[in-house]
Amino acid sequence: MRSNQAGITLTEVTIVMVLAAIVTVGLVTFYVNSQATWMDASTQALAQRDATLVIEQIATETRTAYVAKVSPDAAGNPMLVLYDIGNDEFARFWWNEKGDSLIHRGEGNPSKDLGAIAVTKVDEFQVDSNDTLVFVRPLRMHSTTGQPVEMTSSMALYNR
């Protein structure tokens, strides 16, 4: 072999390719894991937003109510019915467990379903009331990736 020859050997090329492959696999793995983490966090944030929306909708209507009554619906789930000072029903909230598994708002008797408040599936909805307060404990939802979200709240009947 002559001493003035320049170039790289097959062994050197193989080593460089193996190192490049290891770096590429590491970068792809990091990207995929980051993407999965972002998706989980994003869907959980959406579920939290929907749970907050449901609680805020119930609270807004409850604050204007004179009387709040909780009774079981046809499926045995608690249904919150709100009445004004003239004892006229103006809002009701229920969990459609057997149907779309969402919290619905309605009004009137018999209830006119105004549709679901939010689109995140509900696992549990418990509501109770006394003379001056309405308690939601708990409202349990799950994100599309299965992350649980749970909220509880108490709200006052300010129109008493």
Spans of model-derived segments:
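Edge beta-strand at a domain terminus
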Residues: 148-160
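Type IV pilin-like appendage domain
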Residues: 69-133, 150
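Aliphatic-rich helix starts adjacent to a transmembrane/signal segment
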Residues: 4-59, 63
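Short, exposed beta-strand-loop hairpins at the edges of beta-sheets
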Residues: 138-147
